[in-house]
């Protein structure tokens, strides 16, 4: 069975005619091998993908821009946040970043370091990054599938630059201390939707873009 995250990523690639895809954390290529992109780069220090290196080392030498980036590497909050910040600097305007494991099923799945037992899924503290991203006040949803799939779309060219200047950097100290129980308390206030709802929104947006490109709709029309 093809994972939902694969279907969502392929939908984005097809819907917006994206070509360049980056995956951080490939493991056994369950996702990577099923992604239908013209150009794919997969980064993992142990197995899978196309490059055997850490994401930090990759971003130090990378010169490419990407349309879609999927972050599913180290599941410690500070590393996920660093991967997100670095990804922003190599994401094209209008591009999309997907993040995995933002809705752990219980507090036992939401800890880091990951336990050495067979407890699955192993979400770590990835979920805390949602609060950093929400602080940006940009387009961001959490899809209620698998263990929570975050979807951030960059519509703002001014978000780029040195990661230390991003608004989210000011929230890092706060978000890293948020307990899992607190997240559960405010869960109903989070932008959590179903995948089909997000896909419908993206379809409407793409139609609008095409009408604007053809001069059939003003850019400020709503």
Regions found by a protein language model. Give the residues of each.
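A short alpha-helical cap/connector motif
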Residues: 1-70, 74-98, 102-222
């Amino acid at each position: 069975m093809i994972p939902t995250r694969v279907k969502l990523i392929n939908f984005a690639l097809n819907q917006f005619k994206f070509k360049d895809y980056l995956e951080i954390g490939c493991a056994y290529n369950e996702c990577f091998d099923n992604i239908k992109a013209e150009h794919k780069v997969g980064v993992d220090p142990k197995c899978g993908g196309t490059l055997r290196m850490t994401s930090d080392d990759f971003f130090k030498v990378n010169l490419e821009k990407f349309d879609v980036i999927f972050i599913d590497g180290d599941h410690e909050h500070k590393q996920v946040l660093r991967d997100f910040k670095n990804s922003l600097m190599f994401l094209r305007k209008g591009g999309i970043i997907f993040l995995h494991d933002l809705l752990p099923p219980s507090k036992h799945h939401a800890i880091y370091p990951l336990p050495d037992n067979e407890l699955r899924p192993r979400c770590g503290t990835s979920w805390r990054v949602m609060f950093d991203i929400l602080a940006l006040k940009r387009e961001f949803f959490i899809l209620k599938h698998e263990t929570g799939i975050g979807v951030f779309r960059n519509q703002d060219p001014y978000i780029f630059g040195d990661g230390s200047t991003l608004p989210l950097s000011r929230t890092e100290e706060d978000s890293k201390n948020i307990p899992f129980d607190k997240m559960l308390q405010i869960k109903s206030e989070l932008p959590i939707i179903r995948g089909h709802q997000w896909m419908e929104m993206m379809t409407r947006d793409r139609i609008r873009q095409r009408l604007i490109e053809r001069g059939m709709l003003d850019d400020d029309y709503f």
